[in-house]
């Protein structure tokens, strides 16, 4: 397999990631609506820590730090988007 083949596979994964990201952000908007209706804060650190723990375990030692960075960024983006809707 040459580099072009590998990049083609990454492109397919990137396409899927964008679709999943958009779905996640749409759900984040629904969460923002719920939080607003129930007077809940946008930031939910306990929930974020729960997710970080779970995904870190799923990723394993080799990728834990990268997985935590990815999800921390996702949380920041979700909070930012929720704040625009709140």
Regions found by a protein language model. Give the residues of each.
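Domain-level signature for soluble enzymes in the chorismate/prephenate branch of the shikimate pathway
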Residues: 1-86
């Amino acid at each position: 397999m040459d580099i072009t083949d590998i990049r083609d596979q990454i492109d397919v994964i990137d396409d899927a990631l964008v679709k999943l990201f958009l779905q996640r952000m749409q759900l984040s908007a629904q969460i923002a609506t719920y939080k607003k209706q129930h007077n809940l804060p946008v930031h939910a650190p306990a929930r974020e820590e729960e997710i970080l723990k779970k995904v870190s375990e799923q990723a394993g030692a080799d990728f834990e730090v990268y997985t935590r960075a990815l999800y921390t960024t996702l949380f920041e983006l979700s909070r930012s988007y929720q704040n625009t809707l709140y």
